[in-house]
Amino acid sequence: RDVNKPSVLLFIDNIFRFVQAGSEVSALLGRMPSAVGYQPTLGTEMGSLQERITSTKEGSITSIQAVYVPADDPTDPAPATTFAHLDATTVLPRGLAAKGIYPAVDPLDSTSTMLQPWIVGEEHHETAQGVKQTLQRYKELQDIIAILGLDESSEEDRLTVARARKIERFLSQPFFVAEVFTGSPGKYVSLPETIKGFQMILPGXLDN
């Protein structure tokens, strides 16, 4: 970027290896470990690396990083320190993959600083928030349903569950990247079509 002045696409697989290497070097140097055994300089080292991956007037660097989450705990110091430097995160939980939903992306835990009304537009932003609210309510209801059953839920909660399940299936349309898992050929769905689909599911236009 600084010498040849190109725009660079950088893949890091896996950023957790950088943390592990720092931890091992720190142990060899005899430094006192901090939380969960990580090096005391974890925040400084991660900041130094991530801040070099930035856009300047000379060129830009777009970085895509795979982040291993130990014990599926996002509060672990290694992933937590990494996430603090990222503009967007895509969370791939085992639970969704086990349900056969591909690509197994969790819309609730995934984040993006670009999902703002002045960037994506009011319509897109409002629809995304509506989808997340429905999925969040569904998540809250799952424990109750597991104990009492869906039939004991209120009519409103049953509708929420039905719509949330439609949303989950809608998010698992036959994508090209999922062909190997689903056996279904991939299909391209434009963003306006996707937003329109959610706008039909959320108010109940497809309940029947």
From Swiss-Prot:
Catalysed reactions, semicolon-separated: ATP + H2O + 4 H(+)(in) = ADP + phosphate + 5 H(+)(out)
Chief localization: plastid
Cellular localisation: Plastid, Chloroplast thylakoid membrane
GO biological process: proton motive force-driven mitochondrial ATP synthesis
Membrane topology category: Peripheral membrane protein
One GO CC annotation: mitochondrion
Keywords tagged on the record: ATP synthesis, ATP-binding, CF(1), Chloroplast, Hydrogen ion transport, Ion transport, Membrane, Nucleotide-binding, Plastid, Thylakoid, Translocase, Transport
Its EC number(s): 7.1.2.2
Enzyme class: translocase
PANTHER family noted in UniProt: ATP SYNTHASE, ATP SYNTHASE SUBUNIT BETA, MITOCHONDRIAL
Subunit and partners: F-type ATPases have 2 components, CF(1) - the catalytic core - and CF(0) - the membrane proton channel. CF(1) has five subunits: alpha(3), beta(3), gamma(1), delta(1), epsilon(1). CF(0) has four main subunits: a(1), b(1), b'(1) and c(9-12).
Family: Belongs to the ATPase alpha/beta chains family.
UniProt name for this protein: ATP synthase subunit beta, chloroplastic
Naturally occurring in which organism (per UniProt): Lonchitis hirsuta (Tomato fern)
